[in-house]
């Protein structure tokens, strides 16, 4: 009887804790109460590690982000910063001042107009562009990935980093402490012995009950000499080249940027370097003056536990609410928060062309089931869903009207929006947006549309599994 009393006490304590800390997020509270009901003895342990935002609040207080504040006046002076809608090349934006003001005011990274971009649509193209830029580095190379494997392509990156370090180029290398947990020590040691500076980003220390395990760095950044930057969905591994038979062809999107917005990719890396290493890099040569090589308007948005605003989620929500003609989304994991979910439904019933591409086969069965749980109600409002059949689609792209497109590291899910360190580039009515739109149309041609009537007839067992996983969706 004593153990039953103990279970009851723990249950009551957990319930009170969850209701106290999660009252502002009812869906999250329901998910945790569901776990508590099913697993009362281990629920609190999981909640301790995964749910609470103590560590997040600590990171915000540290002010670890936006390290370039000391350089702000200098950087703004040497950048073509756009502060008013009249400065935009995009005539459509003059009718969307509310969204423009939101983007300007909610992100400390300004919108800049002196950029040239290149959309990269697969691993082969992306890795070639990255490695070529790295080989020509003169001052520094900054490399940061969520997943970095020691396979064939990983060794090619290693070779270039080592060669450039021996030539005197400063090479800094970050990988996430969970996403790249299996990166061999021998691989890291070889890099370090050659002069490459390496750090894990917030590696969890289970012996000390470290809550940082919930806050992962999902960013993929390469910056070369402060002049060329890369951001998008591609990690470093042979699977991103389609070399894993179980996965097959890997469809992804990355963006190469030259120009003023590289400053803010650099700033994101330096913020992460500070959190990973404790070193505050304040070298002015990390932000060299740029020769204006293009006139594309780009804004870099970063979000994570070190930020007050959930900037990427708020950008997506704001863009969806002003859409007039189309909302096209590509995402490997579709677990929208309530705001995004309602915005999609309202857009569809208002006559906006809403199309969403998701994988036919996912690399996560649990997440895939949770994603499907959102499909039927959205189909009933007029949203069109397509399942990519050519292989696995991992791109994270949002296109709204002829107004803007985003390419980045954030999935359309709650973990990316509210917990992970993420990075997104927003492009405005330029050649990059045209390329993203053309790629989306091609991806549709390699996909099958989900028919509402057929989807309604899916097996009861699948519907049950979807319901159960959806209850966990705020945690996935």
Which role fits each region the language model picked out?
Residues 385-389:
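Active-site donor-binding acidic/aromatic loop of nucleotide-activated sugar
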Residues 330:
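Short alpha-helical functional segments enriched in proximate histidine and acidic residues
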Residues 342, 368-372:
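Short glycine/threonine-rich loop-to-helix capping motif typified by GTGT followed
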Residues 396:
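Catalytic-core elements of nucleic-acid end-processing and repair enzymes
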Residues 323, 333-355, 359-360, 364:
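Helical hairpin unit composed of two closely spaced alpha helices linked by a short loop
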């Amino acid at each position: 009887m004593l153990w039953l009393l103990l279970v009851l006490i723990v249950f009551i304590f957990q319930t009170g804790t969850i209701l106290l800390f999660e009252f502002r997020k009812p869906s999250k509270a329901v998910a945790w109460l569901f776990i508590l009901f099913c697993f009362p003895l281990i629920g609190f342990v999981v909640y301790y590690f995964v749910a609470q935002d103590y560590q997040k609040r600590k990171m915000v207080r540290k002010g670890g982000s936006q390290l370039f504040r000391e350089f702000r006046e200098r950087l703004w002076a040497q950048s073509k910063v756009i502060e008013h809608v009249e400065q935009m090349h995009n005539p459509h934006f003059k009718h969307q001042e509310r969204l423009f003001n939101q983007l300007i005011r909610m992100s400390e990274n300004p919108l800049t107009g002196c950029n040239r971009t290149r959309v990269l649509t697969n691993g082969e193209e992306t890795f070639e562009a990255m490695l070529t830029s790295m080989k020509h580095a003169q001052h520094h190379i900054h490399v940061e990935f969520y997943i970095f494997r020691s396979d064939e392509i990983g060794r090619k990156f290693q070779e270039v980093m080592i060669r450039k370090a021996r030539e005197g180029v400063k090479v800094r290398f970050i990988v996430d402490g969970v996403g790249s947990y299996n990166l061999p020590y021998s691989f890291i040691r070889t890099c370090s012995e050659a002069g490459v500076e390496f750090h894990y980003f917030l590696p969890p220390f289970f012996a000390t009950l470290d809550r940082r395990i919930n806050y992962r760095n999902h960013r993929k950044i390469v910056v070369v000499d402060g002049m060329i930057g890369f951001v998008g969905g591609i990690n470093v591994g042979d699977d991103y080249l389609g070399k894993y038979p179980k996965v097959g062809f890997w469809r992804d999107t990355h963006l190469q940027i030259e120009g003023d917005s590289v400053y803010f990719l650099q700033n994101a890396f330096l913020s992460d370097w500070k959190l990973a290493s404790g070193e505050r890099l304040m070298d002015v040569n990390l932000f060299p003056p740029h020769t204006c090589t293009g006139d594309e308007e780009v804004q870099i948005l970063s979000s994570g536990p070190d930020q007050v605003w959930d900037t990427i989620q708020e950008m997506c929500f704001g863009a969806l609410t002003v859409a007039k003609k189309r909302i096209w989304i590509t995402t490997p994991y579709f677990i929208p928060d309530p705001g995004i979910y309602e915005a999609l439904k309202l857009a569809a019933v208002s006559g906006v062309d809403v199309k969403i591409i998701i994988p036919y086969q996912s690399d996560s069965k649990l997440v895939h089931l949770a994603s499907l749980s959102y499909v039927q109600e959205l189909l009933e409002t007029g949203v069109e869903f397509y399942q990519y059949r050519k292989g696995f689609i991992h791109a994270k792209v949002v296109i709204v009207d002829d107004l803007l497109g985003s390419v980045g590291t954030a999935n359309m899910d709650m973990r990316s929006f509210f917990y992970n360190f993420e990075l997104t580039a927003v492009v405005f009515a330029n050649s990059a947006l045209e390329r993203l739109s053309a790629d989306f149309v091609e991806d549709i041609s390699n996909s099958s549309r989900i028919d509402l009537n057929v989807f309604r007839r899916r097996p009861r067992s699948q519907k049950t599994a979807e319901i159960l996983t959806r209850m966990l969706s705020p945690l996935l």
